Amino acid sequence: MKPELIIFDWDGTLADTTRPIIRTFQQSFADCGLKAPDADAIRALIGYSLPEIIFRLAPNAGEHLREELAETYAAHYLNPNNHNMTLFPEAIPCLNTLKQQGFWLAVATGKGRTGLDRSITVSYTHL
């Protein structure tokens, strides 16, 4: 049986989002008066939920501070002026080929729908 639907992950599969995610976490921590986490520590957690990443990066932070970090991260991430992620070079040709072959295409992500929509709307409305 031939599959009809192909589901792709967004972060790290279609889009190269590592640098923007790291930069956004580091800025958020600084904005909340905390030492910015090391890039490698953040990179190792990409793919986990936002609350889980914050808990792992700031295990001693209280609930209020973790909520503030999450709100600050979301505000930075959703700011259209901070958009600078790119799709991997092979992503669009691959998606176009699969679409032409009649496959339904979808994106799954651990980020909220608002974040995904923003990423797509800013630069990739042709997808």
Where are these regions (language model features)?
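Alpha-helix N-cap/helix-start and coil->helix boundary motif
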Residues: 22, 47, 51, 92, ...
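Conserved small/polar residues in nucleotide/adenosyl-binding loops
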Residues: 125-126
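Active-site neighborhood of HAD-like aspartate-dependent phosphohydrolases
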Residues: 2-44
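Metal-dependent phosphoesterase signature
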Residues: 55-93
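Helix-loop "lid/cap" segments that line or gate small-molecule binding pockets
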Residues: 28-29, 49-63, 119
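Short, acidic loop-to-helix structural element flanking the phosphoryl-transfer center
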Residues: 79-107, 113-118
